[in-house]
């Protein structure tokens, strides 16, 4: 009797395509996890978990941290550490996402206060992410950098 129940359950899983393994996250779910964690630390951990070793990260021309950085260490040093040390409450608030094949676009608003001047800003922004085999291989930022630069003066 027990054997027939086990065989029946096994057949049910096989025939229904069910698996006992965890579901692979979609590209959209991966990118959302880098923005929508409970804390900035959680977002950072999710980013680190999903970036390819040789990720290419491009900050927009005209933006204070403009340039292309390769690898998470370079990105952390040239972008995230500076955002954390030079700004108060700097954040990206996603409005929505668009996903197609290997690309995900997140668009929304940056806000923050520049520590040196005490000036705040709001800027519209879009992030274009590209993934391969569930790893983030590139990021490109498009932003109204004028409002950001105005806060620096």
Regions found by a protein language model. Give the residues of each.
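Bacterial Sec-dependent N-terminal signal peptides
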Residues: 1-26
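A solvent-exposed, acidic/Ser-Thr-rich amphipathic alpha-helical stretch
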Residues: 48-99
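Short acidic-aromatic low-complexity motifs
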Residues: 25-54
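A beta-strand edge to alpha-helix "cap/lid" segment located at domain peripheries
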Residues: 19-23, 77-153
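Generic anion/oxyanion-binding catalytic loop in active/binding sites
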Residues: 20, 36, 64-65
């Amino acid at each position: 009797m027990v054997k027939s129940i086990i065989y029946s359950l096994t057949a049910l899983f096989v025939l229904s395509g069910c698996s006992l393994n965890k579901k692979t996250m979609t590209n959209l779910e991966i990118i959302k996890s880098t923005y929508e964690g409970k804390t900035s630390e959680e977002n950072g951990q999710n980013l680190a978990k999903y970036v390819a070793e040789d990720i290419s990260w491009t900050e927009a021309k005209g933006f204070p941290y403009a340039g292309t950085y390769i690898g998470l260490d370079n990105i952390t040093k040239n972008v995230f550490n500076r955002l954390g040390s030079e700004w108060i409450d700097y954040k990206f608030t996603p409005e929505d996402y668009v996903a197609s094949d290997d690309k995900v676009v997140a668009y929304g608003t940056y806000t923050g206060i520049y520590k040196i001047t005490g000036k705040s800003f709001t800027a519209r922004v879009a992030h274009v992410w590209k993934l391969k085999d569930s790893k983030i291989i590139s990021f490109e930022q498009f932003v109204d950098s004028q409002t950001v630069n105005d806060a620096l003066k």
